[in-house]
Amino acid sequence: MGLEYHCPICGLSVSEMKDYDRKRGRNNCQCWKCGSLERHRFTYLFLQMYLGFFKDKRKNILHIAPEKCLYEVFKDYRLYVTANIFENRITKELFDITAIPHKDSCFDLIYCSHVLEHVDDDIQALREFKRTLKPGGRGRGHIVLDLPVRKDLDVTYEDFSLQTAEERKKAFGQEDHVRAYGKDIIDRIRSAGLTVENYYPSELFTPAEMKYYGLTDERLFLCR
């Protein structure tokens, strides 16, 4: 069997990827070497091929809830802030993203993947991203968001009266989620004062390329 899959982050080529979560049908999707999943590989390719982000390391990055595979990509940039609400080996700062302790207009890139669905006031978090992002012009910054969006929901569903893990899992699909995003996600992001575009892997890559890189058709949101 040939080397059918390639991780663009670490460069590993293999005949089959690692299973991640068999209970949810997440088979053949994780890189054996760097641990990347489909969304991480798409983010890397999007930054590389469509934003040209890796051409200059004199940039400031805010990475929320950092993933190890992308930490290795960003760690040598001029300023690289990794942030979370709990400590781990690759987190530099502990803070609530609804009150980011950094000055206005300081980041070239803010990357936040699968975090906002855990945050009570996601709109305020988006406002903080906008505040700390470098403004328009040639050197303008970018916010890259990755969010789980349910195709069966027209309107985002949240209910803060649900407090137990069991209630939240039933309502939102995961014990620590506080909402399920729906088809109104673009309007929700815009309500924080941001412009937003969304990009699907299938719009940017051929089916053969998507298979080669191990991608699913989960979109990214590019905001400013």
Task: Write out the residue ranges for each language-model feature.
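Conserved N-terminal segment of class I S-adenosyl-L-methionine
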Residues: 1-101, 200-222
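S-adenosyl-L-methionine-dependent methyltransferase catalytic module, highlighting the catalytic core
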Residues: 5, 120-224
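Hydrophobic beta-strand segment of the Class I
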Residues: 64, 107-111
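Hydrophobic adenine-recognition pocket in adenosine-nucleotide-binding enzymes
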Residues: 112-115, 148-149
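Surface-exposed loop/turn positions
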Residues: 59, 106, 137-141
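Activation segment
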Residues: 89, 101-104, 119-123
